[in-house]
Amino acid sequence: MRVRPASVYRYLLLGVCALLGIYTVYSIIGYDDGSHVPIHRPQRHLYLTVSQDRIGSRFGKLAPKRILYWTTIFGATVPSTALSDCPGLTDRCVIDTNRHQLDSADAVVFHAADISKFPLPVSRKPDQIFVFNSMETPDNSGRFAVPDGFFNWTSTHLYSSDAIHKYGTFLIPTQIAESRGFKVQSYYVQPKRLVKTMKGIFGLISNCHTKSKRELALQELGKHINVTIGGKCASDDRLKSICPAGVECIDVFEQYPFYIAIENTVCNDYVTEKIWSRITVPSIPIVMRRRVYQNILPPKSFIAMDDYKNPSEMANHLRSLEANSTAYGEYFEWRQKGLWTSAPWNAPGYRNGLCRVCELLWKAKDNETEVYKSYDNIWKWFDNESQCETDEFVRSWLSG
């Protein structure tokens, strides 16, 4: 039988079209835009970000993931609207606080400091994720005993957590923000605000007896440079009420060239409102240990006590900065030159808290993360990762 050339071409054309169709379907189903944001600290959890296309299309018809908050948070009930500020995820997860709905929950979150107030679940589904949650340090998180292997994921201030739950924002290089299409937030300071009316360091302190012995370090530093303490720990009664409760008092802080941002407890990645609520203050924050901040704040944006042998050496450097406006201004170049900005709140790649837990649950659905791992001893993990200090550094620094 003779085959006409036209028939051959027709069959070839149909074959090519079929192959193209298969390729197109595969591309749509298997596509992953690799949505992640490289930041100055290469942390595992920040890279594992689900493509919003995949969440929106592949799982769009599936029921939302249910996150059950088993405990309160320092006695307060978690609102059902807790996911309302999770762009792209607001309808992908729901928050529940009804413990009778345990069997329907995909993840169950336990706030560490409240665990003792509620009986632990007596059973769990094989595919259920139990999450250990705390924004505070181990010593301020209750240390209530739970069975070994009880928790699958961690959600703490530590950058090594499965789902980071930190204070403040993510500061990132402006170049990276622009490459991701983020709106750049300016931290520019009017030069006249860098001219100070007061000398030395200002601090607003309410905890007068800390584990790190911050008070001893400041007391000794005050022998070499002016250190003004306001709040409950002020020695001058007039300074005790200098800043009313709930007021940031930026106008007071910016009168001084330096301000105290030392935490009550010095632990890895533990950076609270002492920094974040004053990030716009045109003064240089003083911290205790550089290692805690160097991967969280821009380079040369703060001064650490452990950069100096002793209080005298530190005071000499601070006084030299007071006397040299050019050298002092170098600590604000990240602002003035627009080198750093904030990632948009809960943007992909920078999810925080429950938003990150929700995102991870969808990754688990797509078999892209370790779902069924467990922590043998959650408190041992928390202590080892936190590396909290007592007074060893201050004792050594004072004798240096």
From Swiss-Prot:
**A Pfam family the protein falls into:** Glyco_transf_10
Free-text cofactor note: Unlike other alpha-(1,3)-fucosyltransferases, appears not to require a divalent metal cation as cofactor.
How does a null allele present? No obvious defect in N-glycan composition.
Which GO BP terms sit in this record? Answer: fucosylation; protein glycosylation
List the pathway annotation.
Protein modification; protein glycosylation
TM stretches of this protein = 11-31
What is known about regulation of its activity?
A: Inhibited by Ni(2+) and to a lesser extent by Mn(2+) and Cu(2+).
**Could you tell me which Gene3D superfamilies the record lists for this protein?**
Glycosyl transferase family 10, C-terminal domain (3.40.50.11660)
- UniProt GO MF annotations: 3-galactosyl-N-acetylglucosaminide 4-alpha-L-fucosyltransferase activity
Q: What is its EC number?
A: 2.4.1.65
Protein modification:
N-glycosylated.
Keyword RNA-binding present in the record's keywords: the answer is no
Reactions listed under catalytic activity: a beta-D-galactosyl-(1->3)-N-acetyl-beta-D-glucosaminyl derivative + GDP-beta-L-fucose = a beta-D-galactosyl-(1->3)-[alpha-L-fucosyl-(1->4)]-N-acetyl-beta-D-glucosaminyl derivative + GDP + H(+)
Q: Which UniProt keywords apply?
A: Glycoprotein, Glycosyltransferase, Golgi apparatus, Membrane, Signal-anchor, Transferase, Transmembrane, Transmembrane helix
Which intervals lie on the Lumenal side per UniProt?
32-400
* Record-level GO cellular component terms: Golgi cisterna membrane
Location within or outside the cell:
Golgi apparatus, Golgi stack membrane
Q: How does it sit in the membrane?
A: Single-pass type II membrane protein
Q: Which residues are glycosylated?
A: 152, 226, 324, 367, 384
Which protein family is named in the record?
Belongs to the glycosyltransferase 10 family.
Q: What does this protein do?
A: Catalyzes the addition of fucose in alpha 1-3 linkage. Unlike fut-1, does not add fucose to Man-alpha-1->3-(Man-alpha-1->6)-Man-beta-1->4-GlcNAc-beta-1->4-GlcNAc-beta-1-Asn (M3), Man-alpha-1->3-(Man-alpha-1->6)-Man-beta-1->4-GlcNAc-beta-1->4-(Fuc-alpha-1->6)-GlcNAc-beta-1-Asn (M3F6) or GlcNAc-beta-1->2-Man-alpha-1->3-(GlcNAc-beta-1->2-Man-alpha-1->6)-Man-beta-1-4-GlcNAc-beta-1->4-(Fuc-alpha-1->6)-GlcNAc-beta-1-Asn (GnM3F6) acceptors.
Q: What name does this protein carry? A: Alpha-(1,3)-fucosyltransferase fut-3
